[in-house]
C-alpha cells in the first residue's frame, strides 16, 4: 500500500483536520461538545480533562490496511459514496482523507466527525441528511376548535370549479407575445406597403442625410471624427462587412469603434439607397452606454435623438418610424428574440463589449451562432475593447478579424509604493485606530479573509524588496491591507492630485455604491476638496438614473475640476473625454457561485490585467495622463489576463428560464454550446429550483406559470411573488417589494450615523420582524410625503435614497403594466387587487410564495435564536437586517431574498413567517412515510398533527393549488368570484396564528 502521510491537498478536498472541523460546525452547531450527556461544564478544567479522557477512551483505532482494501473494493462498485459511521480520532480521519486523495476520491467529515463520507464526486461543506441535531425538524401543527370549524365551513361552501383549465397549448394560443413583452419591433420600414414606397423612403433618407452633412455643425464634428483611428479604416471595415457574415473587431479604448462603426454602416446603407431595408441594432451591456452612444451619434449626424438614431432600454425609449440605427441593452434584444427568433428584417447586428463576458452577451452569442445559418443575409459584427479576438473568431467558424489601434497620449503609471513615496501619505496600522489598515502579523491570523494575491504580498520581505524606498513608505507598505479598499488613502491621493498636479478631470475606480458614498461623504467633509466652487464631484454607478449619469460627460466651467467616482462601468462602456488622472483601486465587485454548496459569494476581487489596461487608458484621452494604482506592482504582475466570464460564476435560473422561452431544446445541451460552458452542477441547481417553484415540469418543459415568468424581466422568484400578489389581492405590496429586490434597497447607511439609520429601518419594520415590510413601509411613507411635497425632507430624516425610490416607482409602474398585459390585473379597478394589501399575514404569505425554497429554521438556544438552512446548516442574519438584533422569534421560520457568503454565510432581507404560510404557499406537501404527517423540502421539514387537522390542511392546500392553476392558465378568471371561499379560508387560517 502506498504511503499516505498528511497532505494539504486532502484539506482542499474536504478532508483531514480542516474537514473534520468544518463537518463539526456544519453538522453539530457551535458550543457543547459533551455529546448531550448531562450538564456541560467546559469552563471547569477538572470536568473538561475528565470528559476529554472519556472521549479519547471511546475512540476506535483505524486499521489502515483494512480500510484501504475496503475503499478500493467499494471504488470498483456502482455506488457513488461510502458512508462510514465510526468513532475515529481526527488523526485517523486525516489518514482516511489522505487515502481517498491518493485514490482520486473525495472525503468529508460531517456531524462532528460522526459521519465520514468517501465519494466519487465532490462533497458539499454541509449535509442535512447527516446532521443528527439540525438536519431536519419535527413541528406539531395545532389548531383551535373554532378555527377548525370555520375552515371546514368555508371549504364546504366552496364550489368545485371543474378541471384545471386550459392546456399549455391553449395558453400559447391565447397569448399575444408582442403585447406581453411590451416591446416594439425596430422595423418600421416593414409597414410600407410596396417596393415603390420603400424606394421613396430610401430617397428621402438619402436627401436628408446629404442636407445634414452640409451643415456647419456636422462639418465641425466630421473634422473630429476624421481624426479617430476608426475613420482611417472605414473602407476596409465596410468591405469586410459586405463580404463576410461575421466580423470580429477589436479596438483600443478611444479608437472610435463604438460610435463610428455603426455609423459607417448607416451612412453607407442610406447613401446606397438601401435605407428603407436598413435596420441596424447595436447592443450595449449597460443602459447608460446605449443612451450616451446614441446621443453622440445623433449629434454627429446633426439630428435630435430618436430620429434616424435611437435607443431602447428598460423603462425608457427614444425612437421613431425614421429610426434606422437602434442602440439597446442586451437584455432588450434577448426579449425581442422571444417574440421574433429570426430577428426578422434586422439587416445588421453589432454586439459591443463582448470582452466583458457578461452572462447576457455569452447567452446571445450561442443564439446568434445557431441563428446565422437561417439568416444568411444578416451581418453580425462583434466588438471588443481588448485584443482577444481570436477566441470569438474561432467560435464563429474562424471568421475574419480586424484590429483598430488606439488613440491615447502617454500615460505615466504609479503603483502603491510610488504613490506613497510621492504623496508622503502614511498608512496607519490597526493599532493606531485606522480600521482599513492592519499589521502584517495580525493579518496573517485572519486566514478566512485572504486571497492568493494578498497572501503573495504578505510573504514578501518589505525591507528587502523595497529597499530603494523611504522608511516611511516601507512602514506604510507593512501596514497596508489588500483585504479592503482604504478610502482614506483614496481621498489623500485625490487631494494630492488637486493640490500639486496640473488641471484635468480625475476618474476614480471603486467597487460599488457603498465605497462611492463613503468617499463622497469624506470629500464633502474635507476642508479643501469640499469646496464646491472649485470641485465638481459626481458619482457614477450603473444603476443610477440616466439623467444623473449624463452630467459626467459635460465639461465643468474654467477653474473647476471634475472628480468622477465610478465603478468598472467607466472602464470601457463609457468615455469621459476630459479625464487626465485615473485613481485605480484594483478591485471590482464580482459575484462567484459555489454550485456545490448552492451559495453566492459576493466580494470585491482583484481585476484582470485587461481591465487594468482599460482603466489606465482612460487617462490619456486629451493629453498625457497619470494612472495612480493604489496596490503594489507585485500584485498587478500576478493579475490574471482576463476575468472569468459571468456565465460560469453566477446562479443560472433566470438564464435557464430564458432558454426554455426560446424553445431551443434542453437547457443542458444549449448551454454546452457556450464559449465557455458553465459547470453542469450549476445548471442542475438552476433546473431544480425552477422545478421547485413550479416554472418547469418534471420533463423540463415550461409550465403555464413558467411562461408567465418569462414575460417578467426579473428573477423567477420575484416574478412569482408578483403573480401571487396579484392573485391574492395583495398587488401593491408585491409591486413595491419586487421593485426593491430587483433594483436595490432604498436605505442608505452613512458611516457616521449608522446607528440612527439602523433605527430608522427598524422603525419602518415595527414588530413585523421583516426587512421586506420595512421596505414596503418606507416606500409608502415616501409616497405619502411626495403627495404633500416634502419627500426630500422625509428621505433625509429617514436615511432613504430619493433616487432609488424614484427608480422603484418607475419599476412598479412597469411591473403593473406587465401584469396588466398578461391579464392578471385590470388597472381600471385597483381596489379589486388590493383587498389584503394591509394584511400583514397575507403579505408574509405572498413573500413565502415568492421566496420559497429560501427557508430558514429558527431554533431557540437559551435566550437567543440560531438559524439553519438545508444547504449550509448554521447561517447568520446579515448585520444590516432588522432581524439582526431580534433575540427570540415568535414564529418558527424565516424566508429570505438571498444568502451570500462573505466573511460568513449571511441571509439578507428576511421575514418571519408561520407554519401556515409555509404549508399554504411553500412547496409540495408530501405525506410522510409513516402516514402521520407531511414533509417539505425533501424531508427537511416535517409537520405532524391530528388526522382531522392534517386532512383539513391538505384539502385547503389542494383548493389553493387548484385556484392558482386555474388563474395562471386563464388570467381572465375573476378570483373575487371564483375563489372567494378559498381566499377567505386562507386568510382565516393565516390570521389564526398571529404572533
Swiss-Prot record:
SMART domains in the cross-refs: DEXDc, HA2, HELICc
Annotated ATP binding sites: 251-258
Region annotated Disordered, chain positions: 1-42, 156-192, 429-450
SUPFAM superfamilies, sorted: P-loop containing nucleoside triphosphate hydrolases
Residue ranges of domain Helicase ATP-binding in the record: 238-405
Keyword presence, ATP-binding: yes
Keyword terms of this UniProt record: ATP-binding, Helicase, Hydrolase, Nucleotide-binding, RNA-binding
CDD domains in the record: DEXHc_RHA-like, SF2_C_RHA
InterPro entries associated with the record: DEAD-box_helicase_OB_fold, DEAD/DEAH_box_helicase_dom, DNA/RNA_helicase_DEAH_CS, HA2_WH, Helicase-assoc_dom, Helicase_ATP-bd, Helicase_C-like, P-loop_NTPase
Helicase C-terminal domain: residues covered: 484-663
Bilayer-crossing regions: none
Residue interval(s) of motif DEIH box: 352-355
Biased composition (Gly residues): 25-37
PANTHER family: ATP-DEPENDENT DNA_RNA HELICASE DHX36 (PTHR18934:SF237), ATP-DEPENDENT RNA HELICASE (PTHR18934)
Family per record: Belongs to the DExH box helicase family.
Entry protein name: DExH-box ATP-dependent RNA helicase DExH1
Species, as recorded: Arabidopsis thaliana (Mouse-ear cress)
Amino acid at each position: 500500500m502506498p504511503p499516505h502521510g498528511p497532505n494539504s491537498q486532502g484539506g482542499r478536498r474536504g478532508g483531514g483536520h480542516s474537514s473534520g472541523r468544518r463537518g463539526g460546525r456544519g453538522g453539530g452547531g457551535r458550543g457543547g461538545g459533551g455529546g448531550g450527556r448531562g450538564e456541560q461544564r467546559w469552563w471547569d478544567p477538572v470536568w473538561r480533562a475528565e470528559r476529554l479522557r472519556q472521549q479519547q477512551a471511546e475512540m476506535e483505532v483505524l486499521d489502515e490496511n483494512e480500510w484501504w482494501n475496503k475503499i478500493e473494493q467499494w471504488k470498483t462498485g456502482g455506488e457513488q459514496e461510502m458512508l462510514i459511521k465510526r468513532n475515529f480520532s481526527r488523526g485517523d480521519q486525516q489518514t482516511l482523507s489522505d487515502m481517498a486523495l491518493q485514490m482520486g476520491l473525495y472525503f468529508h467529515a460531517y456531524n462532528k466527525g460522526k459521519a465520514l463520507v468517501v465519494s466519487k464526486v465532490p462533497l458539499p461543506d454541509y449535509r442535512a441528511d447527516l446532521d443528527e441535531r439540525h438536519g431536519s425538524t419535527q413541528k406539531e401543527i395545532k389548531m383551535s376548535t373554532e378555527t377548525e370549524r370555520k375552515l371546514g365551513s368555508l371549504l364546504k361552501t366552496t364550489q368545485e370549479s371543474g378541471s384545471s383549465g386550459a392546456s399549455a397549448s391553449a395558453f400559447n394560443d391565447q397569448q399575444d407575445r408582442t403585447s406581453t413583452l411590451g416591446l416594439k419591433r425596430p422595423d418600421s420600414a416593414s409597414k410600407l406597403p410596396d417596393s415603390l414606397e420603400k424606394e421613396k423612403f430610401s430617397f428621402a433618407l438619402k436627401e436628408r442625410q446629404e442636407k445634414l452633412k452640409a451643415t456647419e455643425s456636422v462639418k465641425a464634428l466630421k473634422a473630429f471624427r476624421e481624426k479617430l483611428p476608426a475613420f482611417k479604416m472605414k473602407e476596409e471595415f465596410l468591405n469586410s462587412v459586405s463580404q463576410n457574415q461575421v466580423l470580429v473587431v477589436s479596438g483600443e479604448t478611444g479608437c472610435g469603434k463604438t460610435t463610428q462603426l455603426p455609423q459607417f454602416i448607416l451612412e453607407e446603407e442610406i447613401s446606397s439607397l438601401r435605407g428603407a431595408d436598413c435596420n441596424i441594432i447595436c447592443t450595449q451591456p449597460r443602459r447608460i452606454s446605449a443612451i450616451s452612444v446614441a446621443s453622440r451619434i445623433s449629434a454627429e449626424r446633426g439630428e435630435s435623438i430618436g430620429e434616424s438614431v435611437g435607443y431602447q432600454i428598460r423603462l425608457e425609449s427614444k425612437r421613431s418610424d425614421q429610426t434606422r440605427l437602434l442602440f439597446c441593452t442586451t437584455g432588450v434584444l434577448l426579449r425581442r428574440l422571444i417574440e421574433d427568433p429570426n430577428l426578422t428584417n434586422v439587416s445588421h447586428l453589432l454586439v459591443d463589449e463582448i470582452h466583458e463576458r457578461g452572462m447576457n452577451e455569452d447567452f446571445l452569442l450561442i443564439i446568434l451562432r445557431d441563428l446565422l445559418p437561417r439568416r444568411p443575409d444578416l451581418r453580425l459584427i462583434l466588438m471588443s475593447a481588448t485584443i482577444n479576438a481570436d477566441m470569438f473568431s474561432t467560435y464563429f467558424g474562424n471568421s475574419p478579424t480586424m484590429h483598430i489601434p488606439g488613440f491615447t497620449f502617454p500615460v505615466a503609471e504609479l503603483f502603491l509604493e510610488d504613490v506613497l513615496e510621492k504623496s508622503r501619505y502614511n498608512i496607519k496600522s490597526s493599532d493606531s485606530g485606522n480600521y482599513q489598515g492592519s499589521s502584517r502579523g495580525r493579518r496573517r491570523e485572519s486566514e478566512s479573509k485572504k486571497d492568493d494575491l494578498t497572501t503573495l504580498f504578505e510573504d514578501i520581505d518589505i525591507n528587502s524588496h523595497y529597499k530603494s524606498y523611504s522608511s516611511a513608505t516601507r512602514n506604510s507598505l507593512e501596514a497596508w491591507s489588500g483585504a479592503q479598499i482604504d478610502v482614506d488613502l483614496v481621498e489623500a491621493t485625490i487631494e494630492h492630485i488637486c493640490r500639486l498636479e496640473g488641471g484635468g478631470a480625475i476618474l476614480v475606480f471603486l467597487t460599488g455604491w457603498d465605497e462611492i458614498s463613503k468617499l463622497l461623504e469624506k470629500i464633502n467633509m474635507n476642508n479643501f476638496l469640499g469646496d464646491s466652487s472649485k470641485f465638481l464631484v459626481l458619482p457614477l454607478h450603473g444603476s443610477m438614473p440616466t439623467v444623473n449619469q449624463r452630467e459626467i460627460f459635460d465639461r465643468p466651467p474654467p477653474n473647476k475640476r471634475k472628480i468622477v467616482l465610478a465603478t468598472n462601468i467607466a472602464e470601457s462602456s463609457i468615455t469621459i473625454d476630459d479625464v487626465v488622472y485615473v485613481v485605480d483601486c484594483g478591485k471590482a465587485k464580482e459575484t462567484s457561485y459555489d454550485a456545490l454548496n448552492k451559495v453566492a459569494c459576493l466580494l470585491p476581487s482583484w481585476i484582470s490585467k485587461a481591465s487594468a489596461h482599460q482603466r489606465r487608458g482612460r487617462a490619456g484621452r486629451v493629453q498625457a495622463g497619470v494612472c495612480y494604482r493604489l496596490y503594489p506592482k507585485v500584485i498587478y504582475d500576478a493579475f490574471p489576463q482576463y476575468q472569468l466570464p459571468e456565465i460560469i460564476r453566477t446562479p443560472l435560473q433566470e438564464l435557464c428560464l430564458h432558454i426554455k422561452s426560446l424553445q431551443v431544446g434542453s437547457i443542458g445541451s444549449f448551454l454546452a454550446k457556450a464559449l465557455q460552458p458553465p459547470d453542469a452542477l450549476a445548471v442542475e441547481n438552476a433546473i431544480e429550483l425552477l422545478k421547485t417553484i413550479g416554472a418547469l415540469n418534471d420533463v423540463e418543459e415550461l409550465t403555464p406559470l413558467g411562461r408567465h415568468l418569462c414575460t417578467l424581466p426579473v428573477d423567477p422568484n420575484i416574478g412569482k411573488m408578483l403573480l401571487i400578489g396579484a392573485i391574492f389581492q395583495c398587488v401593491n405590496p408585491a409591486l413595491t417589494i419586487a421593485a426593491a429586490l430587483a433594483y436595490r434597497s432604498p436605505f442608505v447607511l452613512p458611516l457616521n450615523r449608522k446607528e440612527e439609520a439602523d433605527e430608522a429601518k427598524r422603525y419602518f419594520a415595527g414588530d413585523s420582524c421583516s426587512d421586506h415590510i420595512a421596505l414596503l413601509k418606507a416606500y409608502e411613507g415616501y409616497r405619502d410625503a411626495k403627495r404633500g411635497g416634502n419627500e426630500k425632507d422625509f428621505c433625509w430624516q429617514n436615511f432613504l435614497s430619493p433616487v432609488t425610490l424614484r427608480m422603484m416607482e418607475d419599476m412598479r409602474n412597469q411591473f403593473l403594466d406587465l401584469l396588466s398585459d398578461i391579464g392578471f390585473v385590470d388597472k381600471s379597478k385597483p381596489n379589486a387587487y388590493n383587498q389584503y394589501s394591509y394584511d400583514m399575514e397575507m403579505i408574509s404569505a405572498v413573500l413565502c410564495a415568492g421566496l420559497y425554497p429560501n427557508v430558514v429554521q429558527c431554533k431557540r438556544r437559551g435566550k437567543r435564536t440560531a438559524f439553519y438552512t438545508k444547504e449550509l446548516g448554521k447561517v447568520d442574519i446579515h448585520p444590516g437586517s432588522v432581524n439582526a438584533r431580534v433575540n427570540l422569534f415568535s414564529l418558527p421560520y424565516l424566508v429570505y431574498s438571498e444568502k451570500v457568503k462573505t466573511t460568513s454565510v449571511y441571509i439578507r432581507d428576511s421575514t418571519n413567517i408561520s407554519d401556515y404560510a409555509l404549508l399554504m404557499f411553500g412547496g409540495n406537501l408530501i405525506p410522510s412515510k409513516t402516514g402521520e404527517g407531511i414533509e417539505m423540502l425533501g424531508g427537511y421539514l416535517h409537520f405532524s398533527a391530528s388526522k382531522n387537522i392534517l386532512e383539513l390542511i391538505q384539502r385547503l392546500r389542494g383548493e389553493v393549488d387548484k385556484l392558482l392553476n386555474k388563474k395562471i392558465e386563464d388570467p381572465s378568471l375573476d378570483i373575487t368570484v371564483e375563489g372567494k371561499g378559498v381566499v377567505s379560508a386562507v386568510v382565516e387560517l393565516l390570521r389564526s396564528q398571529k404572533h
